[in-house]
Amino acid sequence: MRMLFIGVVIALAAIWFLGPREPAQLAIDFTQINITSDIDAYLAEGESGFDDITPNTEKRVIWANGVGEKTSVALVYIHGFSASSEEIRPVPDKVAQALGANLYFTRLRGHGRSNEAMAEADVGQWMQ
């Protein structure tokens, strides 16, 4: 039994280290990002290119003190793989509320949409 366990561990380690890797550009060039003063409109414009977003999973900001009002702390919620902003709600909302912080829900490429949309994205696009 011990030899079987060791064999499985070695096989898994070999797969992990020798398996195929998806080449990806992981550096982000922030100089190309031009966010307008109306953040809600900026996010809505970016999401308008998709007609299959599940309701309430789009990129959005939950403003603590009114639309457009900055706070000293802001939280960014990045959901898990194949999930959406609704993954662990209302936990992020309660943390933001306790801190008096604005809360930004992002939506990774392909997430919060149809099953087919998940196949459209790659690692590099998830970094954008």
Predicted regions and their residues:
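N-terminal cap/lid segment of alpha/beta-hydrolase-fold proteins
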Residues: 26-70
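Short, surface-exposed "cap/lid" segments of acyl-processing enzymes
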Residues: 54-111
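Catalytic nucleophile-loop/oxyanion-hole region of alpha/beta-hydrolase
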Residues: 113-128
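N-terminal membrane-anchoring alpha-helices
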Residues: 1-38
